[in-house]
Amino acid sequence: DTDRSRGLGDVYKRQIYKSSMKLLYAKNFSVDYYEGGYKILTTKDGTQILTVPKGRKTPKDIDKDIIVLKEPVSDLYLVASGVMDMFDKLDAVDTIKFSGLDSDGWYIDSARKALESGRMLYAGKYSKPDYELLVSENCSLAIENTMITHSPQVTEKLKSFDIPSIIEYSSYEEEPLGRVEWVKFFGALTDRDEKADELFNKQVDIVNRIAKTDGTDTDDATKSDTVAFFYITSNGQVQVRKSTDYVPKMISLAGGKYIFDASNDDDTGRSTMNMQLEDFYNGAIDADYLIYNSAIDGGVKNLNELLDKCPVLADFRAVKDGNVFCTTNDMYQQSMSIGYMIDDMHSMITGAPDSGMKYLFKLK
């Protein structure tokens, strides 16, 4: 396999390729396993990491673009905040020494406590890292999210200090479970491959269970309850998800139907879009359920707060029927909980009490 041997020098000559990680949904990374415990992790943009097992030598004449990390991997700089939950569930938070959020920005206890105790250090946000700190404390790798593509000079500067970086592309995954499957990438990176499989399979099981209990007649589209997922921007527009985004797919897996279809989508590359209030009104007034997304503005505590933000919502069917929900503030940091979120949506649609929900609550 010529592609697999590309640039690997002696790894390929001396190390025998064994197998590749089986991926069910994720499309934006791969992991190859070699004899002797060596691994090659590759992301969507072609960046490669070679992990070298403890006590083993780094192969000679390896391509200079390949990032080499010796196990046990440590001193990571985690800028991609959505991934901390994966490290937390993998029991791998101790591999992270630097954070792109300070303690008050985290809903994840282990991260917040590590920063409060000084074991983890705040090293600045993605666009303004504390280079001096990262260099003096021997940062091994920066894990960025796709925002870094807007600040290429940061990646260049990190590189000039011999700090390699990778971008995690879980947000590019169209399937909700494809996002969760990135836990296997970080499981491979931190040598917790089996644990990662376990965590991923647990979320898959939840989704499969919902599909079974749902008994949804997928052919009969008219049966599905419709759901709008939105938030009100500071200038009074309504931000919604495009029909191709992962949130509409979660709604569908939960047995519902997203209220907007492809005919409403704009043609930007983004997963969200802003609508004029009038268009949202016309499109969602008859939605069976409304979910207010709290991730941007901290959300609302009750129905009156929501109606203060947007009085015309009082005309909406979901408001009249008492079917308005809000996401909890920590939802966007809980990347390993997509299965639970789908479960909550399913509970909402089937009329189960909201007391059992983890990431949604009813606005009263």
PLM regions with names:
Residues 1-12:
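Single conserved hydrophobic/aromatic residue that forms the stacking wall/gate
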Residues 210-301:
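Flexible, glycine-rich surface segments
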Residues 42-135, 141-148:
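A short, structured surface patch at a secondary-structure boundary
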Residues 70, 77, 124-129, 145-152, ...:
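Soluble non-cytosolic domains of exported or imported proteins
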Residues 75-78, 96-99, 141-145, 165-168, ...:
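Structural recognition of the beta-strand scaffold that forms the well-ordered cores
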Residues 10-84, 195-229, 352-364:
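Bacterial Sec-exported substrate-binding components of ABC uptake systems
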Residues 173-202, 211, 215, 286-364:
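Structured C-terminal subdomain patch of bacterial secreted/periplasmic proteins
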Residues 74, 82-87, 92, 99-110, ...:
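Extracytoplasmic ligand-binding site segments that recognize negatively charged/polar headgroups
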